[in-house]
């Protein structure tokens, strides 16, 4: 009997020890990039990475020219209030380092302009904080304003949505905790290997939800990550949504700092007989590393020219 117990115990440890070892190794690997000196030199230098992109935006069944600016910067963030800390030295354990993405999109549809912006707050140490803490998204055009905010809580994401459309109205609801399409961009910059692949549950991008007038909900998509067929130095990450057929493909550099080169988004644009499947495209234009919050004098407008933002 003792011999049998010994064998059972031995088999148990032979199985469980490699499991914990692989878990520990995975944890260490997930922190290797963000703990590297290259990461610290690039993201903790007191400046932001600002990249402009040339845009072809699908809207109303047509393609419209515009531009996008992606602003990536690290910040100290409050876990409880989910806002940027004014005095992180006094946070007493409430602080978490995040990589913030501000995505600004502007394009004209005939006489009037769309001005859209997202903010995404993703913890740098995703092994400790695996979910993005907060997303905000706003849209302004001549018809009116809309605003959506997602906050992570213990049950998932609390969503608050405000719109001038009667059918969309002002709403508060909850979504289960799943990966956000909006956080794919920050995951790429932090650690591309953290990108989910295969059949996944995902919450679509807030900006895409606004443009398609589709309420945010957890959806099923097929996600893939692979080498760009035209350039071995680049990677492609692609999403294909089951229900809508909408696709999103992000192309980024294979090596640190994993710069986002371009993206494409294909979906049904327009209403009624004018609806057609079109592809929004954004291609990288200029890059600037700057403490832009200090560059606010009239003479600093030259920096907009360096980014190719003359409009």
Label each region the model flagged.
Residues 26-154, 193-311:
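Acidic, serine/threonine-rich low-complexity disordered tracts
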Residues 1-8:
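Bacterial N-terminal signal peptides that target proteins for export
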Residues 9-18:
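Bacterial N-terminal signal peptides
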Residues 14, 176, 230-232:
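Generic secretory/membrane-interface signal
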Residues 151-200:
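Surface-exposed beta-loop interaction hotspot
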Residues 20-23:
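N-terminal Sec signal peptide cleavage junction
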């Amino acid at each position: 009997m003792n011999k049998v117990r010994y064998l059972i115990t031995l088999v148990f440890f032979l199985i469980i020890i490699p499991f914990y070892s692989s878990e520990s190794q995975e944890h260490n690997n997930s922190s290797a990039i963000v703990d590297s000196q290259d990461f610290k030199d690039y993201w903790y230098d007191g400046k932001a990475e600002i990249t402009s992109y040339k845009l072809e935006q699908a809207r109303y069944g047509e393609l419209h020219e515009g531009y996008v600016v992606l602003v990536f910067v690290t910040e100290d963030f409050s876990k409880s209030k989910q806002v940027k800390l004014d005095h992180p030295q006094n946070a007493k354990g409430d602080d978490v380092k995040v990589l913030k993405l501000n995505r600004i999109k502007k394009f004209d549809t005939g006489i009037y302009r769309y001005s859209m912006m997202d903010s995404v707050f993703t913890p740098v140490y995703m092994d400790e904080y695996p979910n993005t803490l907060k997303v905000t998204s706003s849209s302004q055009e001549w018809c009116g304003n809309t605003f959506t905010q997602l906050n992570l809580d213990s049950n998932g994401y609390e969503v608050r949505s405000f719109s001038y459309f009667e059918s969309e109205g002002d709403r508060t609801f909850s979504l289960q905790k799943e990966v956000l399409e909006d956080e794919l961009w920050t995951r790429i910059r932090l650690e591309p290997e953290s990108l989910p692949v295969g059949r996944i549950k995902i919450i679509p991008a807030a900006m895409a939800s606004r443009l398609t007038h589709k309420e945010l909900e957890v959806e099923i998509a097929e996600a893939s990550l692979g080498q760009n067929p035209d350039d071995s130095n680049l990677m492609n990450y692609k999403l294909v949504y089951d229900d809508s057929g909408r696709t999103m493909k992000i192309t980024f550099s294979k090596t640190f700092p994993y710069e986002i080169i371009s993206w494409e988004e294909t979906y049904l644009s327009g209403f009624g007989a004018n609806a057609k499947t079109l592809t929004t495209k954004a291609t990288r234009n200029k890059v600037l590393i700057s403490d832009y919050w200090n560059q606010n004098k009239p003479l600093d407008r030259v920096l907009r020219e360096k980014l190719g933002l003359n409009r």
